[in-house]
Amino acid sequence: MSMYTHQSNNELIPLKTVSTLNDLIKTIRIIFNQKEINVNEIHKILNDFQCDFTEWQKYIYFNKTHYTRNLIDEGNGRYNLFLLCWSEDQGTRIHDHSGAHCFVKLIKGCIKETIFEWPKYFTVEKSNYSINQIDLPLTVKSVSEMRPGDVTYMHDKIGIHRLHNPSTTETAITLHLYFPPYTNSMIFEESTSRMKKMDVTFHSKFGKQIPQ
């Protein structure tokens, strides 16, 4: 359960309990109606938020061959709120976030996050990809494990990362908030640092599976 106040145009929104998924969606929409977005405020709301697990059920789709991305709210083009559903031992490729701010909250299971330094040929400030990519392995910056309720924040200025469900017996579910939303990202080979573009697609939208 989360309690929040938010100042909008010098008017204080009354204290409200955020204890349902619908409350969370409304709260996030209020925040994104403002000109300036406070990432610390978003982190606190997501960190404090808990709801009944049954509220996630319509967005949960598992696939034995790959994790699934399931859209909950597209925020009028300003953000994407979605669930990732991970079967046993599934993970992402190492990837960037196309300049977006990315929050991840673990709903169920365990997720291992490995953050890597940017390849030597890449300059984040200039978004400069070198044509001559040197085949050097990526450098690990940090490794951590998320437990239910944990919230992490990621941005390209921090590095690139990989998420993985390390369990061979349990599934995992994560809630993601990305802003601004994006339709593709760069994926990287760990052993060579080489990269290529990957489209970002959804397995389901608003609880309905998309025909593949």
Curated annotation (Swiss-Prot):
Fe cation binds at H95, H97, H161. One of its GO terms (biological process) is L-cysteine catabolic process. It is an enzyme of class 1 (oxidoreductase). It catalyses: L-cysteine + O2 = 3-sulfino-L-alanine + H(+). The keyword Thylakoid does not apply. Pathway: Organosulfur biosynthesis; taurine biosynthesis; hypotaurine from L-cysteine: step 1/2. InterPro entries: CDO_1, RmlC-like_jellyroll, RmlC_Cupin_sf. The thioether cross-link between Cys-102 and Tyr-178 plays a structural role through stabilizing the Fe(2+) ion, and prevents the production of highly damaging free hydroxyl radicals by holding the oxygen radical via hydroxyl hydrogen. Its cofactor is Fe cation. Binds 1 Fe cation per subunit. There is a cross-link at C102-Y178 (3'-(S-cysteinyl)-tyrosine (Cys-Tyr)). Keywords: Dioxygenase, Iron, Metal-binding, Oxidoreductase, Thioether bond. Its EC number is 1.13.11.20. Belongs to the cysteine dioxygenase family. This is Cysteine dioxygenase. The gene is CDO.
